[in-house]
Amino acid sequence: MDDSEVESTASILASVKEQEAQFEKLTRALEEERRHVSAQLERVRVSPQDANPLMANGTLTRRHQNGRFVGDADLERQKFSDLKLNGPQDHSHLLYSTIPRMQEPGQIVETYTEEDPEGAMSVVSVETSDDGTTRRTETTVKKVVKTVTTRTVQPVAMGPDGLPVDASSVSNNYIQTLGRDFRKNGNGGPGPYVGQAGTATLPRNFHYPPDGYSRHYEDGYPGGSDNYGSLSRVTRIEERYRPSMEGYRAPSRQDVYGPQPQVRVGGSSVDLHRFHPEPYGLEDDQRSMGYDDLDYGMMSDYGTARRTGTPSDPRRRLRSYEDMIGEEVPSDQYYWAPLAQHERGSLASLDSLRKGGPPPPNWRQPELPEVIAMLGFRLDAVKSNAAAYLQHLCYRNDKVKTDVRKLKGIPVLVGLLDHPKKEVHLGACGALKNISFGRDQDNKIAIKNCDGVPALVRLLRKARDMDLTEVITGTLWNLSSHDSIKMEIVDHALHALTDEVIIPHSGWEREPNEDCKPRHIEWESVLTNTAGCLRNVSSERSEARRKLRECDGLVDALIFIVQAEIGQKDSDSKLVENCVCLLRNLSYQVHREIPQAERYQEAAPNVANNTGPHAASCFGAKKGKDEWFSRGKKPIEDPANDTVDFPKRTSPARGYELLFQPEVVRIYISLLKESKTPAILEASAGAIQNLCAGRWTYGRYIRSALRQEKALSAIADLLTNEHERVVKAASGALRNLAVDARNKELIGKHAIPNLVKNLPGGQQNSSWNFSEDTVISILNTINEVIAENLEAAKKLRETQGIEKLVLINKSGNRSEKEVRAAALVLQTIWGYKELRKPLEKEGWKKSDFQVNLNNASRSQSSHSYDDSTLPLIDRNQKSDKKPDREEIQMSNMGSNTKSLDNNYSTPNERGDHNRTLDRSGDLGDMEPLKGTTPLMQDEGQESLEEELDVLVLDDEGGQVSYPSMQKI
C-alpha cells in the first residue's frame, strides 16, 4: 500500500470519527428537545376552558408566550410545515408531532400524538337553578393516540474536507418527518408527498413568517406565485406577484430569508456548512453566484432560485439548487432538499423541460434588465445563458434591440467577446449579430463606439471552429452596411478576413506550383458572410477599393471560388453573388485607380492636332488623301477586324491585374448565360460596363473579346428581364460596348428593339414604372448606338421609337433629365438628312424635334433653369464644328452635371443622380451600389444580415426548435 492510499484511509477514518462526534452532539440536542417537549405537553390539557385560540381552527394546542409559541426554531419549523404546507384541509385530528430524537447513535425515534376524530365523545349535563332556569352544558372529550417510531441511521463516510465522499453511499440516511397522513394515501399506500431516499430531515428552503402571518398553500407551491424561471414563454404573471422594478435588487446571500440550516440550533455554524454548501440563487452585483471553478459543468439535476411575492418581501422561499426539474417531478408538489453533496455542477439544463412539454405553469421568463445584469455575473454558465437568451429576445424584435442599447447592454456584450470560454463569447457574439441587424443604425454605431470591430477581429483570429467563425463574420457583415463603419472594417478586419477565412477555405494556393482544389463547400456559409462584408465595404470610396485590390490573395481567391462554383454547375448561390458583386465593385474606376494606371491610357480617336498640317479650318479638319483612301471612308477601328489578342505576359497575372484579364471576362460571360439570379446578372453586366469604360488599353481589348465570345446577344437579352436593375445594368454595358464601331453596328441591329420597348409610353405600360435613372440610361444608350450609325437610326424609326421620344418630350409629366435625354436622341435623329423626308411624310415636323423645357417637370430641381429651346444640329455640319462625338456638351443641358471623371456612369444610389448625362469627356464606370440600398438587400437579410432564433447557433434556413440551453 503506497503513501497515498494510507493517507486516504487515514483521512476517511478521521472524517468518520468526526461525524460520529457530530451525531453524538445531535443526539444530546434531540434528547434535550424531547425533555423540553414533554414538559410542555404536561401543561397542555384538552378542554374548552384552556383551549388555545388556534384550537378554533383545529390545528395546534400550544400556548402563546409573548406572541410566540414555546419551543425552539426546529419546533417552530415543524409547526409551520403543518400550518402552511399542508393547507387548510382537515387537520383537526393532528395535535402535535415531535422532531426525531436519537436514543443512541444509529437510531432515531419519532413520536406522533394524534387525535382520533371518530373517537370523540360528547358529555351533556343539565342543571336546574333555584329560580327554575335550566342550564345545559356539553363537553367534548377527544381520544388521543401516541405513536412512537424508531428508525435506523447509518453513518456517512466523510472526506478530508468534511463532506460526504460519494453521493451513492449516503442513500437512505435521513427520512422525512412529514405526518403519516402525508406519507400515505387514502388506500394506505405512499402518498404524493413522500420524497426520495436520502433527503434531509427539514427542508433547507423553509422561510417561515412572523407570527400572525398565515397563507394557506393548497398543494405545495402557491398557485399564483411568480416563480422565477428562465425561458418559460407560456406563463402569465399574476399582478399581485409581479415584482416592482423600482428599487429592485436581486436577492443576496446576506438576506435574512436565506436557506435554513438542516441541523438543530445546538450545532455550530461550522457543522452546518460542512453538511451543505450555499445554495444558488440570484445575487446582487457585488457577489458571485457560487463556485468560480473553471471546470464547472452543467448538471441536469440542479434548479435555480424561485421567487414568490415581491422582491422586497422576506416571506418567500428560494428553491434549492438540488431540486429536480422538468418531467422528473410534477410542478404541483413540494419536495424536500436531499443531502447536500460536494457538487461540480451549476444551473440546470432546460432539456427536460423542453422535451417533457410546456414548462411548469408558475415559471416566468426574466425581465430584460435582469438578463442584462446576468451578463456581469462571475459565473460563466449564467453569462452564457444570459447572452444566448438575449440573442433569442432580440430576434426580429427591434424594440428589444433598442432597449438593450439604452440599458447599456452592448458594452457588456462586446466585453464578453474576449472571454476565454467559447460558450460565453459565442453567446455574446450571437446577441451582437441580432442587435446589429435591422434598420436602427444607432445599434450599429453603439457597437462601433464600444470598439466592437477590433474585438470581433481578435475573436476571429482565435476562432478555429466553423460555427463561431460564421457568427463573427455574420456580425461584421451586418455592421458593414453602415457607411461610417465601412472604413473601420477595412482598416481592422480586411487582412484577418482574407488570411483567416477567404484564402484558407477557398482552396486557392499562393504558390503557383501547388495544386488548387476547391474545398470551400463545407465553409460556404462562412465564405458567404465574409464576401458579403467585403462587398459592402468595397462601395465606400476609392481608398477602400484600393486596399481591397492590393490585399494579397484576395482577388485570386475570389476568382477561384467563382470558377469552382461555375464548374460545379452552381452559378446561382449566394456565395457566387457576393463574390461577383465584390469583383464588380473592385473593377469600378480600375483604369484610374490601379498603380501606374497612366501606362494603360490611350488618346481619344479622331482628335486632331490644332497645329500642323491637319489643323482644323472653319469647315472642319483637313485630311490628307492618303489617310482618306487608306481608311476607305471607314472608321479607324475596322469593323472587319474581329480578332484581338491581349498583351503577352512574361508572368501569370496576380492580384488586381486579374480584374481585367481574359479569364475574368469569360467568368462574366458564363454567368450571363447560365445564371438566373437577378443580382448575379446585374453584377456581371455591371462589371463588364466598368471594364469597358474609359480610354485604356484593356478596355479596348475587352470590348473586342466580348464580341468574339458572342456576349453581345446575351447582354441584349437582359433588356427583357423583369427586374429593373438588370435592365439598367445591361443598358449601361451596351452603351460602353458601343464605343467599338463593330459592336455599335451589331447592337444597333439586335438591341434597338428591346431598348425602345423599355421606354415609357405606347402599348407597353410596364416601363412607366421604371425609375428616372433607368429611363435616362436607356435613352443615353440609344443615343450612343445611333450616333454615326444611320442603320441604327432607321431601326429606331421602324420600331416606333420616335413616338415614344416625342411623348417624353411633349407629355409634361416626365422629369427634366428625362426630357433632356430624349431631346438629345431626337436631335441626333434630325441630324440625318436621309431621315428628314421620310419623317415629314409620316407627319413629323421640325418642331417635334425641338425641346421646350417649359414642359419639363420642375419637381426634382430647386434651382432655376434655362427655358430656351435647344438648337437643332445638322449632321452634315458635325465634322466642321467639333470632332467625332462632341457635337453638344452635355454639361450645357443640365446645371447639375458633374465633371469628366464620372461620365457614362450609373447614378450613385446615395443620392447623387446627376452623372448620367455628362458626356463631355471619356467614358465612365458603373458606380458601386451603396447607401440606402446596400449591395445586397432583401427582407430578413440586409446585406444578408442574419438573425437567428436559436441559442446554439445554426444557419437561418434550419432553425432549431429550442436547442439545449441552461436555465438562467
Curated annotation (Swiss-Prot):
Positions bearing Phosphoserine: 4, 47, 125, 225, 230, 252, 268-269, 288, 300, 320, 346, 349, 352, 617, 713, 811, 847, 857, 859, 861, 864, 868, 879, 899, 920, 943
Chain positions of site Essential for interaction with cadherins: 401, 478
Single GO molecular function: signaling receptor binding
Recorded consequence of changing residue 478 to A: Complete loss of cadherin interaction
Cross-link Glycyl lysine isopeptide (Lys-Gly) (interchain with G-Cter in SUMO2): residue positions: 421, 517, 882
Inducing factors: Induced in vascular endothelium by wounding. This effect is potentiated by prior laminar shear stress, which enhances wound closure.
Role, per record: Key regulator of cell-cell adhesion that associates with and regulates the cell adhesion properties of both C-, E- and N-cadherins, being critical for their surface stability. Promotes localization and retention of DSG3 at cell-cell junctions, via its interaction with DSG3. Beside cell-cell adhesion, regulates gene transcription through several transcription factors including ZBTB33/Kaiso2 and GLIS2, and the activity of Rho family GTPases and downstream cytoskeletal dynamics.
Record lineage: Eukaryota, Metazoa, Chordata, Craniata, Vertebrata
Repressor keyword on record: no
Cysteine disulfide partners in this protein: none
Protein family membership: Belongs to the beta-catenin family.
Effect listed in the UniProt record for changing residue 477 to A: Severely disrupts cadherin interaction
Gene designation: CTNND1
Effect of residue 363 to A: Severely disrupts cadherin interaction
Residue stretches of biased makeup (Polar residues): 889-908
Domain statement: A possible nuclear localization signal exists in all isoforms where Asp-626--631-Arg are deleted. ARM repeats 1 to 5 mediate interaction with cadherins.
SUPFAM superfamilies referenced in this protein's UniProt entry, alphabetically: ARM repeat
InterPro entries named among the record's database cross-references: ARM-like (IPR011989), ARM-type_fold (IPR016024), Armadillo (IPR000225), Plakophilin/d_Catenin (IPR028435)
Residue list for modification Phosphotyrosine: 112, 217, 221, 228, 257, 280, 291, 865, 904
Protein name: Catenin delta-1
Coiled coil: 10-46
Associated disease: Blepharocheilodontic syndrome 2: A form of blepharocheilodontic syndrome, a rare autosomal dominant disorder. It is characterized by lower eyelid ectropion, upper eyelid distichiasis, euryblepharon, bilateral cleft lip and palate, and features of ectodermal dysplasia, including hair anomalies, conical teeth and tooth agenesis. An additional rare manifestation is imperforate anus. There is considerable phenotypic variability among affected individuals.
Binding partners and assembly: Belongs to a multiprotein cell-cell adhesion complex that also contains E-cadherin/CDH1, alpha-catenin/CTNNA1, beta-catenin/CTNNB1, and gamma-catenin/JUP. Component of a cadherin:catenin adhesion complex composed of at least of CDH26, beta-catenin/CTNNB1, alpha-catenin/CTNNA1 and p120 catenin/CTNND1. Binds to the C-terminal fragment of PSEN1 and mutually competes for CDH1. Interacts with ZBTB33. Interacts with GLIS2. Interacts with FER. Interacts with NANOS1 (via N-terminal region). Interacts (via N-terminus) with GNA12; the interaction regulates CDH1-mediated cell-cell adhesion.
PTM note: Phosphorylated by FER and other protein-tyrosine kinases. Phosphorylated at Ser-288 by PAK5. Dephosphorylated by PTPRJ.
